[in-house]
Curated annotation (Swiss-Prot):
The lineage of its organism: Bacteria, Pseudomonadati, Pseudomonadota, Alphaproteobacteria, Rhodospirillales. The gene is coaE. This is Dephospho-CoA kinase. It is an enzyme of class 2 (transferase). It holds the Pfam family CoaE. Belongs to the CoaE family. Disulfide bonds: none annotated.
């Protein structure tokens, strides 16, 4: 079974790329969705988060806004949260991979926002980085409810710069020109990893514009 790692900074279009891969028939393990499930009523992280951050659990689920207010700008608090969440996310990922190995699935995707930052590339056969011009990234993110420039800058400060991600990528997925070029590149990657076409040089180059 081949494993494609999918990552990209906030606002780059990673969720759209993951949805395209699902439509191409590739199973996707979404780390963010796993966190949402862990924080939901009955989720495996609720009790531990409640103990570490009193007052953030309401009606049996983690209130992400309240949690964010306690963690935002506090590096020590963030590390406490990560110590709770990351092992549970990895356990869910291992279950996903084991299930698809048993099913003899040929290709799966690990959708991980902080893939390089957490050294997740070591678990992947190939890493795809979703990228767009910085001005478009900012416009997308600032259009989200409750998002401010300060919050965006804080998120970006915790993420590897886009140029560095592209330099480390095996393939760059462009989203700056719309869905068409992104889908074309993803189809080529899927075909290559499934073995239905020869390998081709599809890597990124940080010295070039990210597919404007």
């Amino acid at each position: 079974m081949k494993i494609l790692g999918l990552t990209g900074s906030i606002g780059m279009g990673k969720s759209t790329a993951a949805a395209m891969l699902r439509r191409l028939g590739v199973p996707v393990h979404d780390a963010d969705a796993t966190v949402h499930a862990l924080f939901a009523r009955g989720g495996k992280a609720v009790a531990a988060v409640d103990a570490a951050f009193p007052g953030v659990v309401r009606d049996g689920a983690v209130d992400r806004t309240a949690l964010g207010a306690q963690v935002f700008g506090d590096g020590a608090a963030l590390k406490r949260l990560e110590a709770i969440v990351h092992p549970l996310v990895r356990a869910a990922e291992r279950d996903f991979l084991a299930r698809h190995r048993r099913a003899r699935t040929r290709l799966v995707v690990l959708d991980i926002p902080l893939l390089f930052e957490t050294h997740g590339e070591s678990r992947c056969d190939l890493v795809a980085v979703v990228s767009a011009p910085a001005f478009l990234q900012a416009a997308r993110v600032l259009a989200r409810p409750g998002m401010t420039r300060q919050r965006l800058d804080a998120v970006l400060a915790k993420q590897m710069p886009d140029g560095q991600k592209r330099r480390r990528a095996d393939v760059v997925i462009p989203t700056g020109l719309g869905k068409g070029p992104a889908l074309k590149r993803l189809k080529a990657v899927v075909a290559m990893m499934r073995g239905s076409r020869p390998a081709a040089p599809v890597g990124g180059d940080a010295s070039k514009p990210p597919f404007y």
